[in-house]
Amino acid sequence: MALLQISEPGLSAAPHQRRLAVGIDLGTTHSLVATVRSGQAETLMDSEERYLLPSVVRYHEKGPEIGWLARQQAAYDPANTISSVKRMMGRSLADIQQRYPNLPYQFQASENGLPLINTATGLVDPIQVSSDILKSLVQRAEETLDGKLDGVVITVPAYFDDAQRQGTKDAARLAGLHVLRLLNEPTAAAIAYGLDSGQEGVIAVYDLGGGTFDVSILRLSRGVFEVLATGGDTALGGDDFDLILADWIREQAGIGSRDDHSLQRQLLDMATQVKIALSDADIAEINIAGWQGKITRCEFEALITPLIKRTLLASRRALKDAEVSADEVLQVVMVGGSTRVPLVRHRVGEFFGREPLTSIDPDKVVAVGASIQADILVGNKPDSDMLLLDVIPLSLGLETMGGLVEKIIPRNTTIPVAKAQEFTTFKDGQSAMSIHVVQGERELVSDCRSLARFTLRGIPPLPAGGAHIRVTFQVDADGLLNVSALEKSTGVEAFIQVKPSYGLSDEEIARMIKDSMANAQEDINARQLAEQKVEAARVLESVTSALEKDADLLNEQEQAAIDAAVETLITSVQGNDPEIIENAIKQLDKQTQEFAARRMDSSIRRALAGHSVDEI
């Protein structure tokens, strides 16, 4: 089945009319655009027959320069030449400056704390920079295909959160594009290989690009791609190989520091050339700033080994999350230019126990997969049997009384997905309910990540437990979360789309998962205590209300017994023993059973007053 078989608004559904769609790999270091022509996916080249476009934009008086020309000027005009902007997408300025303290740009914060970069043409943000890169790719595509595009599929790292995905969508809209879908990069690579081979089983996608590392464990079964688990590092890639090599060259040559941005750019360019050379040769020459030297492949491999180990640790975590062993992995797909490094291929093959797949150019494979998906989504392949199922990396839920987390969608649930659950009011006459959306694996809200808050108002003032509120969590195909709350009797509804103000790194995700495992028993104990305290508060609220209304139904001895049980429960709640609280609740319940029966009788008598038996 095709993911989409309906016509887009304004588009003809005529079967003979082929629509123009492309897949775009919006990368940290380089970007590409690909399309399907005559049944074959191909990357589109520029006028000089280059398929890669450096993800670099230089802003100067005459307007933005994009790609190769901008990259050439980076060493001479670093403050106005923006590169690796993907790392800034969806992050706050404070987060960026903490993660990347040596960036040569003049930053200032927007009203909501997001980064603005001061350039020769004024202030720009990461969305604007990404939009300019997209415009260049679209211009290439439309000139090559001789027509306007009907839609695009843009790839993003699997670990991009809501804010980063939304920023990518905003950049595309700013470029005037109709986004058919955002697609995880590893999933796009699986399309590129999986459709051709038709093999079934578990595959691993190892994606080491310029600025991000992603690993995905997928299962191919009867044409369905299901992502079992994802992992990675949003701040690790070939750029880091270049950086560590540039530092080595600087140390060997005894020149400058990272604060010399012009020299730093020259060093990084030289490091890139050396890295590429060492993929084929055992030794590489270095000539920079009047210094000449050499580096062997063994020396280079010693420098990058710690970085490769980090990728393999993330791969091991992903396998554990997917509940599969390395032996069960039938294929390993290599993605990203950095996988050309011989040591990377060797260590990955050693880790998974099999030779990784490299038959499709690792620079092109993501764009190729995206173009195949775009061709399907735009309606050119209505008979395709391919279906994609991505997953969410962390559980989504909301806060309940006592600071507890009620998980609505557990982590690694395939998306798109929608799940609903009913909740009720805690107090008599409650007319509003605060909805606090959280993300994480722990049992208490204080240990999870807050995503958003909103309030449902207009709840009818009924007794506690009388109103019924249906809360729905819906995650779309792009991983964006929509939460709605509906009061069933009145139809009153509140809604929010979750857009975190800054990104969540994979290190934080891994830490949150690890913490949930390490604190599992402690969390269970804390939850049990919190649940008993919530129940105690409910019982005390109910008993207090009943005494205020009908204390005259009790004699002094009965009143004293109930008061004593109430005091015992209040005292127990101040402690931290759930069993003591539970026993105090039971004791109060026992003391109030006769009182409850009398209240029921009294209520019935009042209801029947003035009515004859015949009327009843």
From Swiss-Prot:
Highest taxon listed in the record's lineage: Bacteria
Keyword Kinase: no
Molecular function per GO: ATP binding; ATP hydrolysis activity; ATP-dependent protein folding chaperone; unfolded protein binding
Any one GO BP annotation for this protein: iron-sulfur cluster assembly
InterPro entries named among the record's database cross-references: ATPase_NBD, Heat_shock_70_CS, HscA_NBD, HSP70_C_sf, HSP70_peptide-bd_sf, Hsp_70_fam, ISC_FeS_clus_asmbl_HscA
Function: Chaperone involved in the maturation of iron-sulfur cluster-containing proteins. Has a low intrinsic ATPase activity which is markedly stimulated by HscB. Involved in the maturation of IscU.
Family: Belongs to the heat shock protein 70 family.
Official protein name in the record: Chaperone protein HscA
Provenance organism: Photorhabdus laumondii subsp. laumondii (strain DSM 15139 / CIP 105565 / TT01) (Photorhabdus luminescens subsp. laumondii)
